[in-house]
């Protein structure tokens, strides 16, 4: 399944969550798109709820189905709770860490920065958005890319960095100090439903 590239606001309303991180998509119209307005949401079956939760998380991180399933299977081989491990692995992706550091305003922008070779990991260029960042690794911006407006504007408006990250706005450099705890990640997601979906 290919990555969704359509209007994010429309998808946000369909899934009932903000994919931009701003919440603006749901402020005026907190219901699914379509001609029937706010009363059109149907009661979902158990399978429908599980599928919807999977789609919410997949689109939140902007990954395709193959990448999503591969990471889910990888999480299942780790000690601990399968669902929590999966959430932590998703959050450890390089594109997500770039976004959480405030170097991009959306995960889609962060993925583009990585793809185009603007991001360094421990001083070396890494252009793979799915690269899993390890605790202790440093994320920075290439010298030639430091004046990109997309980065400068993002850093200027960002006023929150999670506790498991540190960020130096002057150096445009951050450190993934530790793995996040489940309580620090997407409270609107019920990962148990996703585990149930893939266990069918």
Swiss-Prot record:
The keyword Transmembrane helix does not apply. GO terms for biological process: ribosomal small subunit biogenesis; translation. It comes from the Bacteria. Pfam families: Ribosomal_S4, S4. One of its GO terms (molecular function) is rRNA binding. InterPro entries: Ribosomal_uS4, Ribosomal_uS4_bac-type, Ribosomal_uS4_CS, Ribosomal_uS4_N, S4_RNA-bd, S4_RNA-bd_sf. Residues 92-155 form the S4 RNA-binding domain. Residues 22-42 are annotated as: Disordered. Belongs to the universal ribosomal protein uS4 family. One of the primary rRNA binding proteins, it binds directly to 16S rRNA where it nucleates assembly of the body of the 30S subunit. With S5 and S12 plays an important role in translational accuracy; many suppressors of streptomycin-dependent mutants of protein S12 are found in this protein, some but not all of which decrease translational accuracy (ram, ribosomal ambiguity mutations). HAMAP family: Ribosomal_uS4_B. PANTHER family: 30S 40S RIBOSOMAL PROTEIN (PTHR11831), SMALL RIBOSOMAL SUBUNIT PROTEIN US4M (PTHR11831:SF4). Part of the 30S ribosomal subunit. Contacts protein S5. The interaction surface between S4 and S5 is involved in control of translational fidelity. This is Small ribosomal subunit protein uS4. It comes from Bacillus subtilis (strain 168). The gene is rpsD.
């Amino acid at each position: 399944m290919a990555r969704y590239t359509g209007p994010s606001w429309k998808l946000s309303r369909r899934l009932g969550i903000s994919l931009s991180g701003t919440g603006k998509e749901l402020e005026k119209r907190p219901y699914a798109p379509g001609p029937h307005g706010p009363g059109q949401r149907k009661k979902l079956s158990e399978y429908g709820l599980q599928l919807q939760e999977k789609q919410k998380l997949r689109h939140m991180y902007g990954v395709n189905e193959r990448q999503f399933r591969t990471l889910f299977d990888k999480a299942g081989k780790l000690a601990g709770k399968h669902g929590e491990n999966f959430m932590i692995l998703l959050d450890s992706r390089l594109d997500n860490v770039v976004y959480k550091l405030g170097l991009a305003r959306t995960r889609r922008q962060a993925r583009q920065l990585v793809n185009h070779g603007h991001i360094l990991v421990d001083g070396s260029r890494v252009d793979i958005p799915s690269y899993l960042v390890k605790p202790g690794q440093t994320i920075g911006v290439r010298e030639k890319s430091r004046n990109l407006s997309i980065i400068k504007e993002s850093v200027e408006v960002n006023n929150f960095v999670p506790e498991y990250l540190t960020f130096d706005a002057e150096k445009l450099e951050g450190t993934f100090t530790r793995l996040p705890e489940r309580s620090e990640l997407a409270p609107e997601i019920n990962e148990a439903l996703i585990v149930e979906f893939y266990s069918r």
